[in-house]
Each structure stands twice: as C-alpha cells, then as structure tokens.
Amino acid sequence: ISEYPLYEIGKKVGSIFQDPKSQFFASITEDEIAFGCENYGVPYEELDGRVSSAIKRINGDMLRGKEIYPMSSGEKQKIAVASVNAVDPEIYVFDEPSANLDMYSVEALKNLMGGLKAEGHTIIVAEHRLYYLTDLADRFLYMENGSIKEEWTAGELLSIPEEKRRAIGIRAADLHHIEVDIPPTKEKDMTMEVKDLAFSYRKHPVFHDISFRAYAGDLIAIVGHNGIGKTTLSNILCGMQKEKEGQVIYNGTKVSKGKRKNFAYFVMQNTDCQLFGDSVEEELLLNGKGSTQEQRDDLLKLYGLFEWKERHPATLSGGQKQRLALAVSDWIDTPVLILDEPTSGLDFKNMMRISEHLKALAQKGKTILIIT
C-alpha cells in the first residue's frame, strides 16, 4: 500500500472513525454520503443511485434529509458507514465501531460487516469489544507496544484462560459467563429527583413524563436504543439544555438550568468538547486551582495518565481522553456525576480501573448515572 499515492489509497481503503463527527463535511445526511463520490468525480447520473444504495445498506431511510449534528452517536456512525459505502472501496477499516452502540445496533453493525465480507470486501476492525466478532472475524491480531504479539482464531480466542485474558487486558469474548455481584440495598439520602420531564427538538418530541429519584451512593444505568434521548436527558440534568416541561430537584430544592452545573458534572461521550488545556496536567490545573503537584500526580497515576502529563490532550487516544475527563470530574466534585458511555474505547484493564473507581466514589456517597 506504501506504493500508492494518498488519493489512490482513499479509493481502495475507507475509514470509519471512532468519533464519526470528526470525518463529516456536510450538515445534511445525503450531502455527507455523496461527498466522497463528488470528490472522486463520480458522474451525477450515477451519484443518486450510489447514495440510495448506501442508505439502504444501513437501513437508513428514516435518516434521509435530516441534520447530522443533533443525531445520536449510533446514527452518526451509520452515516459515516454509508458515506464510505457510496465510494465502494475494497477495504473497510473500522475504529472502535461498537463503542457507542446499543446491543441492537451492534447486531445491525455485525450484519452490515457480514454483508460486506460476503461481497468480497476486506474488513479490518480495531476493537475492544470482541463478543460480536467471534463468529465473523477470520483472525484476531493482538497488538502491544506498536507490534503484533499474537494471532488467534475465534476458537483460540475463546479458549484463552481467564487469568491470561485479564493480564493482557482483553475484554471477555463470551458475555454468557460473566458473573455479576449485586450489593444489598441500604437506606440512603435522596440527592436528586426528576418530575414529569419532557423535551422536544424543533417541535419533535424526544421524551416525556420522565420521573425518577436518585440517592446518595446510587450507581444508576440509563439504558435504551440509540437516539432515544439518553444524552439529552443528561444535558438537562447538568444544565446544558433546558427542558420543555417538568422539574429537576437537587437536595429537596427545584434548581434552574443555570445553577445545575453546581450539582451535577457531565463526562461527555465526545470528550474533545470539554478538554481545553495545552497539556494533560494543565487540564487539571484549569479545574483544580490550589492543588499541589503531589495531588495532581497522584490523580494522574490513579487514572493511568502520569506518563502522558506533558502531552496535549488532542494527541491522546479516545480512551485516554475519557480517563482525563474523569480525572477532571474528581476535581469538580459535584454531588452527582453523569457519564456518557464511560468505557467506550477502553481495554479491559482500564475498563476495570474506571469501574473500581466509580464504585469507590459511590461508596463515598456520590450519586453516579451512567449512560450505556
């Protein structure tokens, strides 16, 4: 492939980024799907057919004519896949494609990959979630420090001893044998109450009649299909969007949109939107004035970021950015912490690191809501 100029590689290899938004050039779905073909000079009379075929490939008729920005991450990923499919490359490269998808969408992604494979396309997937690939992938390549260390078939992957799997940081490839410990319920103080919450986007209802209570030490999962309004709900709880109807109550008092940031901190799915420092350490300094060097170093070590302290946040991997945003949330220290897909882009070791830390925060009385 090194023998080809870059513009020729783009015709042969199509990439779907971990953050699809970073590869978009248009604001409307059909325009984005057509963009690559237009740049390669595909005749206009052929272009419409390619766009329609790509939309059909992702079962995306409902996304026709829509603005891309307000879409969910799963919907944005579908548009990214369609834009690559319209160019019709020989090779597809997916970077963490399942990180932001619900189980239903992961199954749809798997079927899409299977269809492309059946047509003779080569599929390369950089992924931490493995369970949906075990009956699809021909080979699994394990990389460490920039080189391929091991190669397995699906059967060999599934037979890796649990101890070795954990040691090398690979997530479980079989979800049917994962043990879950459910701690006993204890009496707690109520931190937050949501009453009859409703929201609409440009007169289109997103959700209505949302009511629930959260208590100190609770760790609550907010689940549902992509595009159902989970992130919008979190934005409202943190004061980044305003509800159409309903109330958000913290510690027994109704709190206006502008003051909710004092009670709840939101770690976004796309952490690029909330990282502003010129280095990892400066990101902590922006949010933790008065902290000591030792405190900052200890926090960076806790999140496995100490060796990257001088790096610019933009140069970090998706998982490292997510851990940095979580470290910042420690400085802010609001009663409620909301996380949007906190384990997306993380390997097993760092996923467990985050899991243990969130459990420790809950044990100290923090209320934690996780979108997943």
Regions found by a protein language model. Name each.
Residues 67-71, 75, 312-316, 320:
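Conserved ABC ATPase signature
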Residues 1-3, 9, 246-260:
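Conserved ABC transporter NBD signature motif
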Residues 92-95, 337-340:
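Catalytic Walker B motif of ABC-type/P-loop ATPase nucleotide-binding domains
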Residues 127-128, 372:
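H-loop/switch region of ABC-family ATPase nucleotide-binding domains
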Residues 238:
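Helix-to-loop junction immediately C-terminal to a conserved catalytic motif
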Residues 46-63, 293-308:
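Conserved ABC ATPase "signature" region
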Residues 223-225:
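The feature captures the beta-strand-to-loop junction immediately N-terminal to the Walker
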